[in-house]
Swiss-Prot record:
NCBIfam families xrefs: hisG (TIGR00070), HisG_C-term (TIGR03455)
GO aspect biological process, one term: L-histidine biosynthetic process
Gene Ontology CC terms, in alphabetical order: cytoplasm
Record pathway: Amino-acid biosynthesis; L-histidine biosynthesis; L-histidine from 5-phospho-alpha-D-ribose 1-diphosphate: step 1/9
Catalytic activity as recorded in UniProt: 1-(5-phospho-beta-D-ribosyl)-ATP + diphosphate = 5-phospho-alpha-D-ribose 1-diphosphate + ATP
Gene, per the UniProt record: hisG
GO MF annotations in UniProt: ATP binding; ATP phosphoribosyltransferase activity; magnesium ion binding
Keyword ATP-binding assigned: yes
Official protein name in the record: ATP phosphoribosyltransferase
Role played: Catalyzes the condensation of ATP and 5-phosphoribose 1-diphosphate to form N'-(5'-phosphoribosyl)-ATP (PR-ATP). Has a crucial role in the pathway because the rate of histidine biosynthesis seems to be controlled primarily by regulation of HisG enzymatic activity.
């Protein structure tokens, strides 16, 4: 029977949507999104979710429309959202690393540092962040809000831009050069202050944060199990670059032990043959969805 307690969750629509839903699935929360729907279904009666742009998430969470939500640190700063920052979740639309807001100019531009922006015109989606950055560097320049396609604006429509990038490939494709990093940002789980003060909601949010972080920790990791003769144990263990000391368990045959270890997936193709040569048997690999520290 339902206890009628529900946590209202805001999920980012747009570039972060697919990677966020995949992360939640690995954490054990399976959302289903119908075409053109902003209301995903979820296999948890205690959750209600709505898809909304990350740029607006902080404001709606601070107002109490959502109890919790996921958005970038950049948008929390840009909108001056009064929220509880629960957890750093370092992932983005295409990778498991932070994004950067960078100052960029045409490759042929004489601008070399932020100081060279004095009296210039800058286009960006993060007007407040850019104005603060200029003020901190003692630079007077005009800042215009950009509704999109910011990379195409220099040099005709702007002298420089402040734009978000993961790899820099889009900037290079538009013949732009990065001058400086303005801000590094990653996704954050945030909470409404009143919701955070509610014991049930806080526990629900904290549990979610733990599982999401565990899913991030497990990215690129696999588990290995194997049996090993005690006589070869030192040799086998010395060749395992494990995240932690391997777990060793006795077997019915007193001359053998079972080993279990978590390693980077990248090394498995070279590690398994070496383990076999060192004397390990019955080696098998398994996927890890969550790794809780």
């Amino acid at each position: 029977m339902s206890n009628n307690k529900v946590l209202k969750l805001g999920l980012p629509k747009g570039s972060l949507q697919d990677s966020t839903l995949e992360l939640f699935a690995n954490a054990g929360f399976h959302f289903s999104v119908q075409s053109r729907s902003y209301f995903p279904s979820i296999d948890d009666d205690e959750l209600e979710a709505i898809l909304i742009r990350a740029q607006e998430m902080g404001r709606y969470v601070s107002l109490g429309a959502f109890d919790a939500g996921l958005t970038g640190k950049d948008w929390i700063i840009e909108t001056d959202a009064d929220v509880v920052e629960v957890a750093d979740l370092v992932y983005s639309k295409a990778s498991m690393r932070p994004v950067r807001w960078v100052l960029a100019v045409p490759e042929s531009s004489p601008i070399k540092t932020v100081k060279d922006l004095e009296g210039k015109h800058i286009a960006t989606e993060v007007v407040n962040i850019t104005k603060k950055y200029l003020a901190e560097n003692g630079v007077n320049a005009s800042v215009e809000f950009s509704w999109g396609a910011t990379e195409v604006k220099p040099p005709e429509l702007a002298d420089a831009i402040v734009e978000v990038t993961e790899t820099g490939s889009s900037l290079r494709a538009n013949k732009l050069r990065i001058v400086e990093t303005v801000l590094q940002s990653n996704t954050q789980l945030i909470a409404n202050k009143a919701a955070w003060a509610d014991p049930w909601k806080r526990k629900k949010i904290e549990n979610m944060a733990m599982l999401l972080q565990g899913a991030i920790n497990a990215q690129g990791k696999v588990g290995l199990k194997m049996n090993a003769p005690k006589a070869a144990l030192d040799k086998i263990m010395s060749g395992i670059p494990a995240l932690r000391q391997p777990t060793v368990s006795d077997l019915a045959d007193k001359e053998w032990v079972a080993l279990e270890v978590i390693v980077s997936e990248k090394i498995v193709r070279t590690l398994i043959p070496e383990l076999k040569r060192a004397g390990a048997e019955g080696i098998f690999e398994y996927n890890i969805n969550k790794l809780i520290d």
